Amino acid sequence: MPNTPHTMNLYIKNIAQLVTCQGTEAKHGREAMGQIHTIEGPAAVVIRDGIITFAGRMADVAPSMTEGCRELDATGRCVLPGFVDSHTHLVFGGYREDEFQWRLAGDSYMSIMERGGGIASTMRATRAESEDELKASAHRHLSNMMKMGVTTVEAKSGYGMNLETELKQLRVVRDLQDEQPLDLYSTFMGAHDTAPEYKGRPTEFIEYLCREVLPEVVRQNLAECCDIFTEKGVFDHEQTRRMLTAAKEAGLSVKMHADEIVPFGGAELAAELGCLSADHLLRISDAGIKALAESNTVATLLPCTAFSLRADYAPARKMIDAGCAVALGSDLNPGSCFSASVPLMFALATLYMGMTVEEAITALTINGAAAIGRADTIGSIEPGKKGDLVVLQYPSYKFLSYHFGMNLVEHTVKGGRVVYTNS
């Protein structure tokens, strides 16, 4: 369907079940995350100029409200907010299929990095590829994500670790925003690892990023957020504090890769620094859980990465019961998780991480939006929010966990436009 103005006006009628996930901030804990605010049908949603103007019972829709709208009949269908993938490494060069086989043979993620694989391997490929090559690859991934109901994607740099390539990655994200339907949230992550030019000198590398790369990222308006890999043997607390403080002073939001490999106090530091989110958290401590539960920092969990690494999953049930706000992200990247599968995220979260399907929906909608600071505009179906929705092939949201491993999306709606239909 062409992206003409009238296509941003949409009337979705005869909805069997409408899941609104209403709210404008992260939902913390079992009770809040379990409340997804369903309306049993017949229900309806009206979108005008890309913004939701009505969401409720179809009987309450006046004819004047839908004048000039395209109609979409959702008889026998469940409608939910568009999914928000709040953690991806979308733009990268090359693949690492051989490393996956090494992992299957028993090599650890850290041992592969020590052999010159891991992030360093992708860094070399990303430095070598052109912007057009990187853009074409990222565009394919976005198209696949759109088919699974994703309407907003966080996209990190971090495979350059020098000025030229970090800017190149972020320009690709900027350009893709205008060349495909999904909304992108750009994150500068030069501190993904220490660049080979600074091997053994991580503090000097952080200073290079703060003094030479970050100012140029900000000057060119290429990022909204800054991320860092806080981990034993990568970047310590003081290096993290230096990087993220500089980013905040430059006007960026901040987030962290935290407590992925070993308990390292990353969650506590993320809460202290006011991060939008602390991500991974496979090895979070009880003190870290308490710190996140008492803060506004979202705990973004990445089940597909744990699955790919054959690692223990993050303690989602324990975190939610303690009062944390949990989001789910794919962690799409060419190494530890070459997948952006929403069906796999739902299956792992509910079958192996102890989350209810309602909590998983919250984690992929309003809490995912909060993890990128956009819960005021996306993540729920209510007047004033963007018209981002998913129409399932089934009448109930419960099929998202029940019919596992399958893409159940019939339509993806972005800003009032039907951008994908499963034909």
From Swiss-Prot:
Coiled coil: none annotated. InterPro entries: Amidohydro-rel, HutI, Metal-dep_hydrolase_composite, Metal_Hydrolase. Its EC number is 3.5.2.7. It comes from the Bacteria. Zn(2+) binds at residues 87, 89, 257, 331. It is found in: Cytoplasm. This is Imidazolonepropionase.
